């Protein structure tokens, strides 16, 4: 009799352990691809999102973050998200314009006067206009993340005037408006995926590139670039995009939990990114790059060049694109 009670107790304890272990295992494992290092604001934001999702779903959903293009280049990642074979891709909006051309309006040179205006637009009417266009192409918009104003780096000379940039071969964003802007400045624009940029700079395939301080510092571009000129020509936000196919298969409570976590992670990432970009210029200089301001009078010359391509962009992007451009211009007056 006593022996039977012992057996029963052991069986019950074993069942409890198995049930506990099963309860702790996530029901859904989602992969999140980030193109940058884990130290960049995007990388830290991705880790924050991972933790917030785990908390909000009580462990039912696990987000696995893969940094520094570990799952492949951005372009392939976006295609996989559309197909439902990858759950999340973090990307600058320029790459997304390959699928949703109207996204290219967000990287018109000298469109945004400041970051606050940009996010007010994206959290408001501009974002509401773009979100269904993304959804139609298979992307569930999870958040607009900050990256900061882009500036030009190169190995030839400091850029203080339009004459200084003429003749440089620069890696640029893969959008028509971005390429047209640099071509109008006399640059040889060379779009390429971010995964290819460091070796291209190292081998002299291109003279330079253009990115915010967070990218320049955390991606260690001081190892392969000499000059960093604060041209402030584009403020390109990031997109956290989830596969529409994956999102719609999740129960409603988990969908709500993920979007709630995304909202909190977005607020957190924006604050971190803006703090980084304010502080990192000194670290970039300490790492060996020569950092120079561009005089306001010179920035006005760059803006004049930029204005020439707005009409071309509006014609290329159709009625919806023109509506977005007009809205962006009006918001930045």
Locate each region found by the language model.
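N-terminal secretory/targeting leader peptides
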Residues: 8-13, 24-117, 125-333
């Amino acid at each position: 009799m006593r022996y039977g009670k012992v057996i029963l107790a052991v069986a019950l304890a074993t069942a409890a352990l198995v049930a506990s272990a099963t309860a702790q295992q996530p029901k859904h494992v989602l992969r999140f691809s980030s193109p940058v290092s884990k130290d960049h604001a995007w990388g830290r934001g991705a880790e924050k999102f991972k933790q917030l999702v785990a908390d909000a779903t009580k462990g039912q959903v696990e987000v696995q973050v893969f940094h520094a293009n570990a799952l492949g280049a951005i372009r392939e990642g976006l295609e996989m998200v559309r197909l439902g074979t990858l759950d999340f891709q973090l990307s600058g909006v320029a790459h997304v314009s390959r699928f949703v051309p109207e996204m290219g309006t967000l990287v018109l040179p000298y469109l945004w006067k400041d970051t606050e205006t940009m996010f007010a637009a994206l959290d408001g009417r501009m974002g509401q206009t773009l979100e269904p266009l993304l959804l139609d192409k298979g992307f569930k918009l999870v958040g607009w993340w900050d990256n900061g104003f882009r500036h030009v780096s190169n190995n030839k000379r400091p850029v203080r005037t339009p004459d200084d940039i003429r003749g440089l071969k620069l890696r640029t964003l893969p959008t028509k408006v971005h390429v047209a802007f640099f071509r109008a400045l006399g640059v040889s624009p060379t779009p390429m995926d971010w995964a290819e940029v460091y070796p291209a700079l190292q081998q002299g395939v291109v003279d330079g590139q253009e990115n915010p301080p967070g990218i320049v510092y955390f991606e260690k571009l001081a190892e392969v670039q000499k000059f960093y000129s604060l041209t402030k020509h584009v403020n390109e936000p990031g997109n956290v995009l989830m596969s529409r196919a994956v999102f719609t298969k999740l129960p409603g409570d988990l969908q709500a939990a993920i979007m709630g976590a995304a909202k909190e992670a977005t607020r957190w990432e924006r604050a971190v990114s803006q703090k980084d970009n304010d502080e990192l210029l000194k670290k970039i200089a300490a790492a060996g790059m020569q950092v120079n301001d561009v005089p306001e009078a010179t920035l006005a010359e760059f803006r004049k060049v930029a204005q020439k391509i707005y009409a071309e962009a509006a014609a290329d992007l159709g009625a919806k694109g023109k509506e977005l451009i007009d809205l962006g211009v009006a918001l930045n007056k």
